[in-house]
């Protein structure tokens, strides 16, 4: 069934990568009124703790993000990617890198193939994601600071080596979720087929894997410990004042899934490294997904996006 949120968009799909004969899809989402010209690009990554979620899952699609793309006649590219635990963090990072290669090398030809007369503007590329997608939006901005101008990270996972992600505790109950036995995860891992990947699932599918990984503090073990997977460590290694995208972070102060204080700390780290004016943090009352009812006229969001637009649209 078509998502009513996408009723005003033309949505097409293709794959940007094949792994072990399995395609990894992306979705090109263009406002229906956009037929010609050189529109900007908004690359979107979905949430789901890197374990669940799907690029087109409607409940996690913030209406304001679609309205923002429409406002600027932007091409929104929402991509799936390999998921934990079937894959590792470096595999996901490889997918992000290859997605941008596809955008640079194949998007223009793909648009012609589907009969579109628009030409993507590679001088105006932004990334956006929610939760785990916010983490990937940040990572992609750091990986491709030559291409990405601003990053919008909504309640992003950032410090995946902190106790919230790395130490077992019964205090972690996103939205009041129950404690799930680790046996659920162990059984899934034992049944995994070698070489078979997972690339997208509409919740609640796979959330029964995300919860025990979070509650048992297994993220570093499941993801891997390579420093490139941890954005604060990546930022730490950069030179002061080095070129980086502008970063807008949005986070609800009562978030039960991803701690808001992590975003507060990350904003400080980003500003210290990339200097004043390189980042804006908007911290408002609410739980995970607190922006679900926000509109482009909501003052804190309007203010944050105006800073993004100055860098992205110019």
Residue ranges and their predicted role:
Residues 294-314:
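Catalytic active-site module of serine/aspartate enzymes centered on a nucleophile-bearing elbow/loop
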Residues 43-45, 154, 283:
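Alpha/beta-hydrolase
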Residues 23, 32-69:
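Short, surface-exposed "cap/lid" segments of acyl-processing enzymes
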Residues 17-19, 55-64, 77-124, 293-300:
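Catalytic nucleophile-loop/oxyanion-hole region of alpha/beta-hydrolase
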Residues 257, 286-299:
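Catalytic histidine-centered segment of alpha/beta-hydrolase-like enzymes
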Residues 1-38, 87-93:
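N-terminal cap/lid segment of alpha/beta-hydrolase-fold proteins
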Residues 98-180:
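Primarily recognizes the serine-hydrolase "nucleophile elbow" in alpha/beta-hydrolase
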Residues 163, 176-285:
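Serine-hydrolase catalytic core
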């Amino acid at each position: 069934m078509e998502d009513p949120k996408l009723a005003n968009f033309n949505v097409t799909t293709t794959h940007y990568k094949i792994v072990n004969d399995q395609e990894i899809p992306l979705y090109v989402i263009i406002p229906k009124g956009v037929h010609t010209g050189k529109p900007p690009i908004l690359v979107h990554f979905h949430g789901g703790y890197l374990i669940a979620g799907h690029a087109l899952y409607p409940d996690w699609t913030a209406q304001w993000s679609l309205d923002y793309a429409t406002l600027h006649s932007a091409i929104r590219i929402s991509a799936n990617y390999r998921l934990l635990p079937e894959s590792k963090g470096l595999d996901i990072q490889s997918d992000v890198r290859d997605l941008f290669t596809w955008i640079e090398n194949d998007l223009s030809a793909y648009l012609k193939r589907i009969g579109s007369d628009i030409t993507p503007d590679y001088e105006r590329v932004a990334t956006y994601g929610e939760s785990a997608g916010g983490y990937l939006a940040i990572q992609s901005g750091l990986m491709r600071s030559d291409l990405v101008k601003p990053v919008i990270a909504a309640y992003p996972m950032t410090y995946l080596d902190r106790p919230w992600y790395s130490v077992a505790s019964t205090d972690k109950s996103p939205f009041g979720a129950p404690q799930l036995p680790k046996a659920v995860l162990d059984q899934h891992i034992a049944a995994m087929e070698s070489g078979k990947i997972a690339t997208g699932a509409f919740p609640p599918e796979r959330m029964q894997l995300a919860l025990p990984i979070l509650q048992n503090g297994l993220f570093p073990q499941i993801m891997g410990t390579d420093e490139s997977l941890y954005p604060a460590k990546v930022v730490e290694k950069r030179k002061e004042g080095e070129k980086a995208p502008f970063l807008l972070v949005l986070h609800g102060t009562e978030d039960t899934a991803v701690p808001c204080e992590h975003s507060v700390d990350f904003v400080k780290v980003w500003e210290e490294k990339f200097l004043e004016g390189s980042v804006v943090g908007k911290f408002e009352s609410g739980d995970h997904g607190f922006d679900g009812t926000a509109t482009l006229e909501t003052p804190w969001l309007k203010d944050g996006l105006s800073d993004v637009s100055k860098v992205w649209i110019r």
